[in-house]
């Protein structure tokens, strides 16, 4: 996850660059980017630590980590992109929001179509709100069959620097 204090550089993407980025996001996430108007303008930012982020209206909506673009929780909350979900029980919420990886015993349900290495949203069972974005270590069937172990590696969660930076922009 990028360490964000300020941006080294920040610039608007050209229409062609924006289309290329959206195509890349849709290809990597296997999900459609929606909720964007026709005049939507993305910005690209480079943080102090060299991490690359995409902004929409001053809010970070995607960040690059290990060569892959991930949606932020704000992008999920705003309906910009919809990715497969893994629902966790309320007992796991405290750990997930502190950045813990997701363990199989805390999972209540799993969306179909998750493949090993897929980017997934971790949501709570009561409110259905996203708590974290991570990478699945198993397919949907594997997740359902597993009885223990780490099943999602957390990359971004409520309360981390990326989340806090987004709060300061609002």
What are these regions (language model features)?
Residues 2-51, 56-59, 64-108, 113-116, ...:
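Beta-strand/loop-dominated core regions that host nucleotide or nucleotide-derived cofactor-binding catalytic loops
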């Amino acid at each position: 996850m990028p360490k964000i204090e300020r941006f080294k550089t920040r610039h608007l993407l050209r229409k062609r660059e924006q289309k290329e980025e959206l195509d890349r996001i849709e290809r990597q996430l296997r999900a459609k980017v929606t909720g964007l108007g026709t005049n939507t303008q993305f910005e690209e930012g480079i943080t102090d630590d060299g991490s690359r982020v995409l902004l929409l209206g001053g809010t970070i909506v995607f960040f690059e980590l290990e060569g892959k673009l991930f949606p932020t929780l704000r992008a999920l909350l705003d309906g910009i992109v919809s990715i497969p979900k893994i629902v966790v029980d309320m007992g796991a919420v405290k750990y997930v929001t502190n950045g813990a990886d997701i363990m199989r015993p805390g999972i209540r349900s799993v969306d179909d179509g998750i493949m090993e290495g897929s980017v997934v949203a971790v949501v709570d069972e009561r409110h259905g709100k996203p708590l974290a974005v991570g990478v699945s270590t198993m397919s949907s069937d594997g997740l359902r069959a597993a009885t223990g172990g780490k099943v999602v590696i957390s990359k971004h969660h409520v309360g981390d620097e990326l989340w806090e930076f987004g709060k300061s922009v609002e």
